[in-house]
From Swiss-Prot:
It catalyses: (2S)-2-hydroxy-3-oxobutyl phosphate + 5-amino-6-(D-ribitylamino)uracil = 6,7-dimethyl-8-(1-D-ribityl)lumazine + phosphate + 2 H2O + H(+). One of its GO terms (cellular component) is riboflavin synthase complex. Keywords: Riboflavin biosynthesis, Transferase. This is 6,7-dimethyl-8-ribityllumazine synthase. Forms an icosahedral capsid composed of 60 subunits, arranged as a dodecamer of pentamers. It comes from Shewanella oneidensis (strain ATCC 700550 / JCM 31522 / CIP 106686 / LMG 19005 / NCIMB 14063 / MR-1). The active site is at H89 (proton donor). One of its GO terms (molecular function) is 6,7-dimethyl-8-ribityllumazine synthase activity. Belongs to the DMRL synthase family. InterPro entries: LS, LS/RS, LS/RS_sf.
Length: 158
């Protein structure tokens, strides 16, 4: 039986982090978590990490698509925070952001890790950006590292 599964070390991986500025006090913590994970666990060097800042979560897919189209990266991490308010705006932003990022992964055959918080309250967002519910930026980086390795193995074996 042949089993393909990734590990989290990817020393030579070139990673782009596309991050929204909206809710910056939260997303900066997500960025710290992602960078720490990439460097400490993935052994990814600073020169192999590019950070792209965009205004908000709606702009993440377009920037990620441009990064993917460049062909210079092994994977993309998308970071942001969308918090439900009193209008349906949350549903549109969260849904379109998620759908757009998933489409890029499939279109370019490139791992795109979803580190965009979609929460009902500010408290939930704070919990997921480095306090008692962990750091979703770090978790997105772990997922990306593993998928970079899985895809490399599949390319070699198939």
């Amino acid at each position: 039986m042949n089993v393909v599964q990734g590990n989290i070390e990817a020393k030579n991986a070139k990673v782009a982090i596309v991050i929204s500025r909206f809710n910056s006090f939260l997303v900066e913590s997500l960025l710290e978590g992602a960078l720490d994970t990439l460097k400490r666990f993935g052994q990814v060097s600073d020169e192999n990490i590019t950070v792209v800042r965009v205004p908000g979560a709606v702009e993440l897919p377009l920037a990620a698509r441009r990064v993917a189209a460049s062909g210079k990266f092994d994977g993309i991490i998308a970071l942001g925070a969308v918090i439900r308010g009193g209008t349906p705006h949350f549903d549109f932003v969260a849904g379109e952001c998620n759908k757009g990022l998933a489409q890029i992964a499939l279109e370019f055959d490139l791992p795109v890790a979803f580190g965009v918080l979609t929460t009902d309250t500010i408290e939930q967002a704070i919990e997921r950006s480095g306090t008692k519910a962990g750091n979703k930026g770090g978790e997105a980086a772990l997922s990306l590292l593993e998928m970079v390795n899985v895809l490399q193995q599949l390319e070699q074996q198939l």
